[in-house]
Structure formats: C-alpha cells, structure tokens
C-alpha cells in the first residue's frame, strides 16, 4: 500500500487486502483489543540496569488479541514465555517487602506484575497512579483482574460453575491460574471446562467487525458469551505448525524461516497449513503466509484450543525452536498426532544420559561428561572431569543457560542460577575443549540416506552457541578431503 501511495494512488483507489471488497479509505471497525508487550533479555547481560528509559532495550515483542483488554493483557503476559501464565496468580508472586514501593514506582519489565500485587495488598488506585503515572483506566482494568482472583480464591473449586468459569475466561485467566487460585490441578480445570462446555470461539481479524466478507484467515481465540464462532471447515487435510514465539538472544528469525518454508512445502503437497504464533515481527504471522493463522500464546492450553478447533491430521513441533519442543511430550499424552521427529526421539537427543548411552553404543567419541542435580554432585563431576567445564541445562536449545566455568566459585554461581533456568532437569557438565574447532553440520536423514546441507565453521571459540556467534561458509580449517 505504501508503494502505491508513493506513486500517486489515493486511498479510495486501493482495495483493502483483508476484505477484497472495500477500499483502503474505508474506516476500520474493530471488535477486538490488541496488546503488545516488549520482550527483554536482561538475564543475558549481567549487571545491566533493568530500569527502562528512552534507550531501546527490548530484543523482541509479543502481541495478543482478545475481546476485552483484560483478556488480551493476560494472553500477552503468558506469550512472553517468562513463566507467567497471566497477570499473576501463577505461583510466582514473591516480592521483597522492604523495597516493594520502589518496585512499583520504578519502570522495569516486571512493573506491571508489581502493580497487580499492590492492588492485591489493598493499595488505592490513586496511590498507584501517583507513583507510576499510569493512566487510571489501565489501573482499573488490572483491578478487575485482581477482583476476579479474589472471587475465584474465595469460591474454591465448589464455586466453579459454568457461569463463573466463563467469566474468568472472558478476563483472560488461564487454566493454570484458575487451578492455582482454587487449589486444583490444571488438567482438573480443563476437564471441568469440557464438562461445562466452556470453550473458546474462533474469531477473525477482518477490519470490519464481520460487516463484510473477509478473504483472509487471520484468527484469534476468545471467550464471548452467546456469540457465534467464525470457524470454517477444512477443504483439505490440515497441519498445524507451532512457530517460535518472541525473538530473544540466541533465537530469532531462523526458526521462523523454517516454519514459513514448512508451510510452503505442505501447501505444495495438498495440505491446508495452520500457523500458531504470537510474534508480530515475523514472516510466519503475515496473514498470507499460511492458509490459517492463529495469533495465540504458545502454551499447552492455548495450543490445545487451536488443535481442538482445527482437528489437524498432524502437528509439527520441531521447527519452532525450544518452545514447541517443550510442548511435544504433553501434546503426545493428549493424543495429538505429532508429525516428523517423535517426542521419544526428541527426549533421546535432549536427555544427556540417554544420549551418552547412544554415543557409547555407536562408538562415537565425546568429551568426558556427566550430569548433576545439586552443587555437591556438580563438584564431584568437576573433580572427576577437571576444569574448565562447559555447563548447560538439559532440554534447552539456543544456548540458554550455557556457560564456561573455570573454577569452583563460578560453578557454585552457575548452579544457583541453573535451577531457575530448568528446575525439572539436571545440569549437564562436560570437559571444555580449549583451542578446538567447532562446526555446525546441517543434515537430513531418513534412516537410509543422509543429505548434508551445509558445514559451517564457528569463528568464536568452541562452546559459544551458534545463535550467539558468527560462522563461516565454507569452513576454512578443513581440508577438501
């Protein structure tokens, strides 16, 4: 559109790509609310001040769509993939009482959660507005969420009627939050929703609130009392592709690139493609990249809502980086057909002990290594293997939580932080090979034939993750043989 305007066209001469029937000058009619939140990565920059200023500090962003501001805000909070399942009520509300007023007043990525906690503690709206300079309207909307939390906590599981569940869902509460507030498990809340028939509706982003027919399949899921779903039945078998979520240090457009090419390849094979993502900065979230696009958080609940609506013949979890891979096991347990690499094969590659056994069986050499769940176990490994050590959590891609430690003090610091990165899986420690050459080899194999796509040589020292480093193609240290 910008190109057409620049060469002299006027808005009334340009068609609206979304509807295909109205001109671009037609005033949009919006029946949804959009919330965007920046994604920060201060954990990658130790010692950097988290206070937000006019300097750009975000590394990515997320976007969510809902029928209400409250719903869109809570969906955006869980889209960030920073363990929050909404605006609090997820078991992460532990704040330093001595400096709490400063936490509320100071602009940081976490301040919105401190504001919600202040309302839980009974702070007046006016006091929060004075401290933060946030418009009272937004404080009132957060107050609505906090009031609903109190109601859910007071009613317990006995108070979870169909009406109250729907009311909570209209405010964006996830099953995890409702479970936390009522003392139940997430799967119990999900089962209760199924019994009551509390399910999200498929809605379309069409710029005209359904007044005109839309040519695009740009969707979001929302809970609306008494409204109709805009879901369309499939003409061909559908495949769901789970994309990567927000950009972060070590993971960016490369995984989105894989998802886009997967959509193209599947379309060429006669499938309808369904993309799920919450990152507005990507090609996968262009409305014309896939047959159907869902702007939804990449959590188990939200992904299952899409799958329940679309009923795909398969779901691809291996092209979107760590986030969809983390969902693979639960999706399989829920009976979802996984296409491509199966969850057990993913576990074989991610579980360091299982992978070491496989390497031993295949007589493939690898640096001395072991796993540890506690600092004492890590010290024992260090004594056996020796420093320096390359340490990283299990079940983590893209270099998150990876470090090189040269002594016991650094090891103790790492182990204290690693439990926050991956609390359910042990830390993997292996001998760090100094002055070694590191290569990235991309290959595709089917058990019979193997195709090597590229061999890249790292310019940085061995151990620097490929997402944080520069590479050279072709490799300059290898012979032609």
Pin down the residues of each PLM region.
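ATP-dependent carboxylate/acyl-activation modules
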Residues: 1-481
